[in-house]
Amino acid sequence: MKKNTIILALLGIMLSLGTLQAQKLYTYPIGVQTYTFRKHFPVKGVEKTLDLIKELGFTEVEGSSNGMGLEEYKKLCDDRGISIPSTGTDFNELIKDPMAVVKRAKTLGSKFVMCPWIPHKKGQFSLADAQKAVEVFNNAGKVLKENGITLCYHDHGFEFQPFEDGTLLDYMIKNTNPQFVSFEMDVLWTMHGGGADMPEKLLKKYPTRFKLMHVKDLRKGVKGDLTGGTPAENDVAVGAGQGNWKQIIKLAKKGGVEHCFIED
């Protein structure tokens, strides 16, 4: 992401909140997903990229150590006043070695670990896939919770396959143990798979299950699907797309979302 695009995203948050900003509705620290800087880290290096993140005003990041040793990366972030409340894992690691996930999170000082993907055949996420995910998340989430870490599943749009009177995402939320498993709402993917008003619907329907949020907007006029993919140009500055940000932030805060991260 280019620097001016990040600034537009920050401005978009403020403009879309309008008078609600003055009422201090948006009280979250300004966070960013380090994936946003995926083109910077290999070229500029970790230290200079973290300098840019600090310069832009971010005080929290979500993500990995970008190839650097965990302790060294944590120190570089600490030196810049940047915390790492959430880091990532993948589905297979949760199955094979949840304690490795715990160790990494604790080294980084992360309270949350998010899993952003469930293996499946593209466009054909099934009940069997959802059932396996529920089992994996409940088992791994228990291990993480026993060690002071909260597992969050990050939705990606493909989970909105119809099921009974709702979707397979509904199935996953209802069948994961809320003591062990929470969720990270990616606003763009939630709209892409479920419709422009789906973020508000989910935050109202499951007000305590979402602990993290990716602040992303979907270009106006884009009709989503269930593939979990869309061209990069459909990711637009917050407030310029389909999201009703006043309502989303209001419901997020009311429901207990603890950290928000801009991502592009």
Question: Where do the PLM segments sit?
Answer:
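Bacterial Sec-dependent N-terminal signal peptides
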Residues: 1-26
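Conserved, mostly hydrophobic/aromatic
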Residues: 32, 53, 61, 77, ...
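A cross-domain feature marking catalytic cores of carbohydrate-active enzymes
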Residues: 32-36, 63-65, 86-91, 115-118, ...
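Acidic-and-aromatic substrate-binding clefts and catalytic sites of carbohydrate-active enzymes
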Residues: 38-43, 60-72, 89-97, 120-124, ...
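Generic structural signal for well-ordered alpha-helices
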Residues: 49-50, 70-74, 98-102, 134-141, ...
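Active-site acidic/histidine proton-transfer and metal-coordination neighborhood
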Residues: 59-60, 91-182
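Acidic/histidine-rich catalytic cores of soluble enzymes
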Residues: 146-242
